[in-house]
From Swiss-Prot:
It comes from Salmonella paratyphi A (strain ATCC 9150 / SARB42). One of its GO terms (molecular function) is sulfite reductase (NADPH) activity. InterPro entries: CysJ, CysJ-like_FAD-binding, CysJ_Proteobact, FAD-bd_FR_type, Flavdoxin-like, Flavodoxin/NO_synth, Flavoprot_Pyr_Nucl_cyt_Rdtase, Flavoprotein-like_sf. The gene is cysJ. GO terms for biological process: cysteine biosynthetic process; hydrogen sulfide biosynthetic process; sulfate assimilation. This is Sulfite reductase [NADPH] flavoprotein alpha-component.
Amino acid sequence: MTTPAPLTGLLPLNPEQLARLQAATTDLTPEQLAWVSGYFWGVLNPRSGAVAVTPAPEGKMPGVTLISASQTGNARRVAEALRDDLLAANLNVTLVNAGDYKFKQIASEKLLVIVTSTQGEGEPPEEAVALHKFLFSKKALKLENTAFAVFSLGDTSYEFFCQSGKDFDSKLAELGGERLLDRVDADVEYQAAASEWRARVVDVLKSRAPVAAPSQSVATGAVNDIHTSPYTKDAPLTATLSVNQKITGRNSEKDVRHIEIDLGDSGLRYQPGDALGVWYQNDPALVKELVELLWLKGDEPVTVDGKTLPLAEALEWHFELTVNTANIVENYATLTRSESLLPLVGDKAQLQHYAATTPIVDMVRFSPAQLDAQALIGLLRPLTPRLYSIASAQAEVESEVHITVGVVRYDIEGRARAGGASSFLAGRVEEEGEVRVFIEHNDNFRLPANPQTPVIMIGPGTGIAPFRAFMQQRAADGAEGKNWLFFGNPHFTEDFLYQVEWQRYVKEGVLNRIDLAWSRDQKEKIYVQDKLREQGAELWRWINDGAHIYVCGDARCMAVDVEKALLEVIAEFGAMDIESADEYLSELRVERRYQRDVY
């Protein structure tokens, strides 16, 4: 595995010193890295009374390796909180990003804790794909002396709830690992479950381990050690929406908005590849409709996180109304004894299908009942922010942040419905209106550190967003590396997002190649994966020249089809079978040369 490029501008080492340090630590285990960290900290603080961490005596249990496998940041936050808990308990812990973990050393781990989310159709988060593939391959080693625990985050509105955590848990046990604790599967409202689990992990590890000397953690890839800001998911910045521009044509079936948000003098910083978290307000009209369907008024007092609020206010600001789940359907059916819904109870597939096709308000319309206000609140999930890939680079836009928003709109039996965050941004926040935002850093979707490295960008639809940021950054840096964009959408005349900008980059020689797939402009549908196969020989040449490959967009179909096409290109032009091509692509992923931001 190659070492991720450091933020050299922030380091007090020159390149030669940094290279020597990296060479000296390449083959160290997490326990050895933790000891080295503590040793140097002690050297620098001889008068503070600090005690350098010493290796565990023979026969004693070594430190804990804590792997964070995060897609939207929640798993990372849980892992960081557990790290702090373990350090407070005087236990030696190494926190490592799954993308940085040297997974071939897993058989030497004594204590292993994994905190993971799930994406797409039950796949692991991007940073954990290589580890997942290794564990499920023939190369996986027996875990003869490894004790482990898994905390899994998911969303019950998806069919493959917490599947990644289930996979890690079952495979580690199958390979011979000993469970420290039973796996915990947490829904969107994960905080209470995580807090309880963290306490149990600390207790069980304290009971197994001798008390260690005060220790230092090695947080490889833990972005909170690099990115600091007073504005977070729980304490967002109140910014100003300055531009809301429709960038699809009048006759397009899609409504895509270019949104610009003014960060003012907040000092909020981001990098190309990061996401913008947006807290939104539910549509007051939707709240009114739901309240009236339940024969309520909206002024009924309800308790939310220990505070008393009017029902309508609670529904607007604190609860998810636009995404139904199987659990909500089942609980509503049981609570109301609905004759139409009770037959679904116990049938997971039918519950999932009903939830996916019937919004909460229409479930209530089709199966009316009378609930008191607090019972309604008890059915619902807390509102969560939506994440949008950032479509700008601060090297060009400075104190602004841009996003590309596909507005979700559809009808249910003639009644207009819309996505919560997208309709909020597109239609309910006026220009110069307030919007609460934060940056979700993504160090697993970064431009190459070397500006001469070629870049291949694959982003159909709104997946184009981060590549606009990439090109702004490459242009501002004067990067000499070649750039190749694959983009697709239904129609050239209606759906060519940011067309003028791409044409300008081509004219200026910044964008060296652009391949476009218009799926509805001819009888035969053409997608970006077809363009990849069409350009297979040249694509393979770029890969051999060290190109980094980036994919952004839909995880369910597009990302799967694109990866299949890449494997076929690698197999054909690299003279490999598909299994070898898969190993090759996995190695590119480990080297950070194949990165995806899919959702």
